[in-house]
Amino acid sequence: MTLASGIEVSPEGVAAICGRYRIRELAVFGSAARGDMRPGSDVDILVEFEPGTHPGLGFFRLEEELSELFGRRVDLGRKSLLKPLVRPSVLRDAVVLYAA
């Protein structure tokens, strides 16, 4: 699949990573979702884990794997931890790439 920003990402790769890390939903937001990325921009990704999943240090491994998959540095955030002030704009921009 191709994001609005022109980044190519493998749906199978996304699904495999999400399965390994017990991710319920993965979405891209920010400039990658809107299509206004700059050359040095990172990819903002929001995840929601399956109930009872506590990734611990696996969160950082997940960020590294996603960076490899997207071919850019990934800034990973948890949907459940979004601050109320930014939540509406983040969710408005979000493009879901995986949902279980």
Regions found by a protein language model. Name each.
Residues 31:
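N-terminal beta1-alpha1 ligand-phosphate binding loop
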Residues 1-25, 34-39, 50-100:
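Catalytic core of pol beta-like nucleotidyltransferases
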